[in-house]
Amino acid sequence: VTSERHPTDQPTVPAGVHLREAENGPAVVPTFFDEVGGTPFFEKLVHDFYVGVATDPVLKPMYPEDDLGPAEHRLVMFLEQFWGGPGTYSEQRGHPRLRQRHVPFKVNPDARDRWLGHMKVGVDAANLPPLQRGILWDYLERAAFAMVNSFDE
């Protein structure tokens, strides 16, 4: 009797690890989504962010809806998917196309910095371990800089 595994055998999954189907089979390591606490983490992060956006004189007018709830929901879905959680964003809205979706709005360095300031409130409130905080903030900062489409004040 041999203890060799057959290539089609499914790996043993540790408790608390959620496998997602990937191009080459199920993922076998926890995703960032799992590491930070999943949906509840992203819901709180995004809610804290939108509390600031709701009163921001530069950012709030960029949202066509008076109620920021739908925008909050979309951002939660996007971040969950980006970080390895459910693919609900793409299922409901298609490819994220972040730059294209932001073209109608004047995103200048001031708007970028305001966006980052409100997001920093949520990130700070999350009290993440330094590694996860650094990974998250690096992405948010790069994404914010990439959305700039105007240098007009």
Question: Can you name each region flagged by the protein language model?
Answer:
Residues T2-E153:
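Core of compact, soluble alpha-helical bundle domains
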